Amino acid sequence: MFKNNLRFTSWINQHKFYQLDLSLKTRSIKQIVLTLVFKTLVLGFFGLIVIFPFYLMVVVSFASDERALDTRTPILWPDSWNFDNFSRVLSDGKYLNAIVVNTLVTVLSVLLTLFFTICMGYSFSLRKWKYKKLVWFFFLSVLILPESALLIGQYRIVIVANWNNPNSPLIVLGLIMPFVSSVFSGFMYRTSFEAIPSQLKESALIDGCNGFNYFLKIALPMVKSTSWTVGILTAFSAWNSYLWPLLLLGNRVDLNINLWVLQQGILDANSSDEQIRTLLNLKMSAAILAILPMFIIYFLFHKRIMNAIKNRANTIKG
């Protein structure tokens, strides 16, 4: 009798555990399916928000002038593929010159930013020097100010240095003024240099390596990922700048690609009462030509760009 009761109790327990395990499996499958559906919907929604403007830009760039002027009907698909729109915006002959100047400004901004921020970050990573904390606090206080608040001081410097003449080669120095240094980039380099073990520097000094050789041959290669991050972010910032070139160049659209895009597709009014009309198909064609170099750079260095964004996010969190 006791054995039968024991067997019956064991069977009941096994049956309960089987039902419990089955319910957990069923619940986990439901959670996985619901989570997958939720992630798909959320990612699809935000992906649509990001991709749709690019899709609209490409579609409108091939539209005819009649459809571009008709603001009542949205252009979701072109009635014809008008590649002539691209040749029309290139006919003014200013695109190539704007691309060359923009590239020169971007390259110089990246090189000078790397030089100044590396020196800044390394100097603040050193352990002791007089008034280090006070000077660092002063630099960090600049981060509180918005970039637009610094334009007045930067513009004043450019005026005093006579770098604001669009007909002079010195205008390039004026255009790179806001991008040659960055406190945030210096902060990134300081964090990276401080992460290098102090024992490594001590071993290098014992082996006869002086301070400059340690910085050049050991410390600098170890912050290569930070250099890629700073370089990529500076390049995008300098290439996409609009307010500062507008302030310096005015109507010289041949010296900045964004100003060139802004002037495309504008129709002169036939009378004083008529509003100025804009051909969006030409403006979108110009926008595609303007972002084409950055798209090429992105596809060549997309892995490093994503790592740069990730490193910047980790720096902000840290």
Curated annotation (Swiss-Prot):
Gene3D superfamilies with a match to the protein in the record: MetI-like
Domain ABC transmembrane type-1: residue ranges: 99-301
Alphabetical GO biological process terms: transmembrane transport
Keyword Cell membrane: yes
Matches recorded under PROSITE patterns: ABC_TM1 (PS50928)
Membrane topology per record: Multi-pass membrane protein
Primary location: membrane
Residue intervals passing through the bilayer: 42-62, 98-118, 134-154, 169-189, 230-250, 282-302
InterPro entries, alphabetized: MetI-like, MetI-like_sf
Domain of life of the source: Bacteria
Compartment(s): Cell membrane
Entry's Gene Ontology cellular component terms: plasma membrane
Gene ablation phenotype (knockout): Probably essential, it was not disrupted in a global transposon mutagenesis study.
Keywords in alphabetical order: Cell membrane, Membrane, Transmembrane, Transmembrane helix, Transport
Protein family according to the UniProt entry: Belongs to the binding-protein-dependent transport system permease family. MalFG subfamily.
Protein name: Probable ABC transporter permease protein MG189
Annotated source species: Mycoplasma genitalium (strain ATCC 33530 / DSM 19775 / NCTC 10195 / G37)
Species lineage: Bacteria, Bacillati, Mycoplasmatota, Mycoplasmoidales, Mycoplasmoidaceae
